[in-house]
């Protein structure tokens, strides 16, 4: 008989970056619904809205070493453990290569790659200590294929894919490291991507139609994949990149 999911993460302690909205917020809500306690981290002050008995909020810049150190310390101070890290924070850029500025390039690398690396580095000693640590990196289909206007973004997400594989090999068997690669998601990220696009609704319809399932993913659906990779149900999986893209990359 299948075990219920309601308490599959009971006792687990997680750090979730980019937690104030979208996939990050949905992940915090799902992990806590399944029994986990969470350090919810974001630069956006809205992260404070998530505070409750199971969640402690941390405001900070994901790409600053002190933020990563504080997140790990807070997990131990408030919940006396650290089992899971979800590297979700990220920035998007839709701009042709020749129009991409030095500042654009540096900022995407800083947030998308440096931020994830710092949180992995600072958390790995604690994750490895108890022998069942889990890291879930939020990559993208853009890290596995080329897409027009996404040179900087594709490069950073490709780095996340390779970081995932490298850490999985380096830290097995005590820490499992996996990634989820979403396609287009109906969140603020999509709003950011379409900023300045004249006919937003027509563009959204076109983007949805490009996915075989015919729609954008919901934040809650990506959170389900993250929760799976953070749970004992995925105990044989490490170094994997799970495509959660409505079939986009199967074409």
What are these regions (language model features)?
Residues 13, 20-21:
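Conserved glycine-rich cofactor-binding loop
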Residues 79, 117-120, 132, 215-244, ...:
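C-terminal substrate-recognition "lid" of short-chain dehydrogenase/reductases
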Residues 96-97, 101-109, 135, 207:
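Substrate-binding pocket helix/loop in short-chain dehydrogenase/reductase
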Residues 98, 145-151, 214, 232:
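Active-site loop immediately N-terminal to the catalytic Tyr-X3-Lys motif
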Residues 120, 156, 164:
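Active-site helix of classical SDR
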Residues 125, 168-173, 235:
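Alpha-helical segment proximal to the catalytic Tyr-Lys
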Residues 140:
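Residue(s) in the substrate-gating loop at a strand-loop-helix junction
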């Amino acid at each position: 008989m299948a075990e219920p999911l309601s308490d599959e993460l009971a006792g687990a302690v997680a750090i979730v970056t980019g937690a104030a909205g979208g996939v990050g917020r949905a992940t915090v809500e799902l992990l806590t619904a399944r029994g986990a306690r969470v350090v919810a981290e974001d630069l956006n002050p809205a992260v404070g809205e998530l505070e409750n008995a199971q969640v402690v909020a941390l405001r900070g810049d994901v790409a600053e070493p002190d933020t990563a150190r504080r997140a790990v310390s807070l997990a131990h101070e408030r919940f006396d453990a650290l089992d899971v890290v979800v590297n979700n924070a990220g920035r998007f850029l839709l701009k042709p290569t020749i129009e991409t500025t030095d500042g654009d390039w540096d900022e995407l690398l800083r947030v998308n790659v440096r931020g994830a690396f710092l949180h992995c580095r600072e958390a790995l000693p604690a994750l490895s200590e108890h022998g069942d640590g889990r890291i879930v990196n939020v990559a993208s289909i853009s890290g596995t294929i080329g897409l027009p206007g996404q040179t900087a973004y594709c490069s950073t997400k490709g780095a996340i894919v390779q970081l995932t594989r490298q850490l999985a090999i380096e830290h097995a068997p005590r820490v499992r490291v996996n990634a989820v690669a979403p396609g287009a998601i109906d969140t603020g990220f999509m709003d950011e991507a379409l900023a300045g696009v004249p006919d937003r609704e027509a563009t959204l319809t076109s983007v949805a139609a490009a996915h075989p399932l015919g729609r954008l993913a919901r934040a809650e659906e990506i959170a389900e994949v993250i929760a799976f990779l953070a749970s004992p149900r995925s105990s044989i999986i490490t170094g994997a990149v799970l495509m959660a893209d409505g079939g986009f990359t199967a074409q």
